[in-house]
Amino acid sequence: HNPETVSTDYDMCDRLYFDELSFERVLDVIDLEQPRGVIVSVGGQIPNNLAMKLHRQSVPVLGTSPISIDRAENRNKFSAMLDQLGIDQPAWQELTSLEDVKGFVGKVGYPVLVRPSYVLSGAAMNVCYDEEELENFLKMAAEVSKEYPVVVSQFLQNTKEIEFDAVAQNGEVVEYAISEHVEFAGVHSGDATLVFPAQKIYFATARRIKKISRQIAKELNISGPFNIQFLARNNEVKVIECNLRASRSFPFVSKVLKRNFIETATRIMLDAPYTQPDKSAFDIDRIGVKASQFSFSRLHKADPVLGVDMSSTGEVGCIGDDFSEALLNAMIATGFRIPRPEKGVMFSSGAMKSKVDLLDASRMLFAKGYKIYATAGTAAFLNAHGVSTEAVFWPDERADAENNVCLLYTSPSPRD
């Protein structure tokens, strides 16, 4: 399907087929090869979506049952399963009219995440913060009707997103990894900066995540890889979704742990023997950070603010003795250049909380000899708190040249 995925190790495969990953083409390959079975859990979302079609054609799907895959992929079935297990999830409804959408929003409040089934133009998903924004999005970008319902979900702000990658056998978790996003929930998992092992989650939160994950694995009788995404705030844990396949973070956590998750998963799916992980293998003295690579600088007038749609064009994974070292390594690997002290750093922050959050960083940079610039409100705040700051107008095409600004820090509001 994607030749680049095997460009460096093409000789590892017995046979390569460069064709579209469609149901018809997969059946053609199956007719030719006559395999013992097929694995659909290591190729992303597209092969996962073929599981039930292959099952109806009596093609043996190795690992987790296609019926279980369908229970996880079908939003209504999965939500009903979570309710049955007593597992919390963000409130959501599938709605067929603007009036119904407004009625649901009246119960849960703004903001809400809107997923249209039929897109007229623009993005497939959008976070709406008020009624005007909601109406404009549904009228301009999507169609709402009985034929084309929209899914509207409660959008939780200032909430941590946590990932649970694991391998299970007959519903029992064999090995797992808990990672956390640096950014708050609302940034696509393909764009978010991932930290493993998780550094800033409560012990009680981690314990609840493990308990919920085991419940889901048992209910779906998972045999193979899976990934569950969680929202967590103040020890309240909600499940976003469960994918019964290897996620994009699978190779990353395997690298950090030095434990090959996908090898274990493959052996389980093939009913082959595998090595049980030692508990000490998960007690590691290193931190991994997976950071995304973006191409905004090459796209004129591209909006660099991240959201629910994926924007990254690549990623890097780095390891350090602690979080700060691993994060710095990852930033440098994505092309970030650390400014020298003789250069200027500029801050632009709207919300008071953001100004307070950057106070320690600005003091440290000032102590290191950096010249501090800021927009009017931010400059007044920093000066009032002992950080000598020069106020400048922004945006200004000449500001970076005249003031020698080599690094701009800005914290846009979610609506910008």
Where do the language-model regions lie?
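A conserved helix-loop-beta module that forms one wall/lid of the active-site cleft
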Residues: 64-125, 384-393
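Short, glycine/polar-rich helix-capping loops at beta-to-alpha or helix-loop-helix junctions
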Residues: 1-12, 75-78, 376-381
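Generic long, charged, amphipathic alpha-helical segments
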Residues: 1, 11, 347-348, 354-359, ...
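Conserved small/polar residues in nucleotide/adenosyl-binding loops
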Residues: 409-416
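Periplasmic-binding protein-like
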Residues: 36-42
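A general structural motif
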Residues: 18-23, 70-74, 323-329, 349-353, ...
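Short hydrophobic/aromatic-enriched beta-strand-loop microsegments
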Residues: 17-19, 58-65, 386-399
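ATP-dependent carboxylate activation and anion-phosphoryl transfer catalytic cores
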Residues: 1-35, 46-48, 55, 60-63, ...
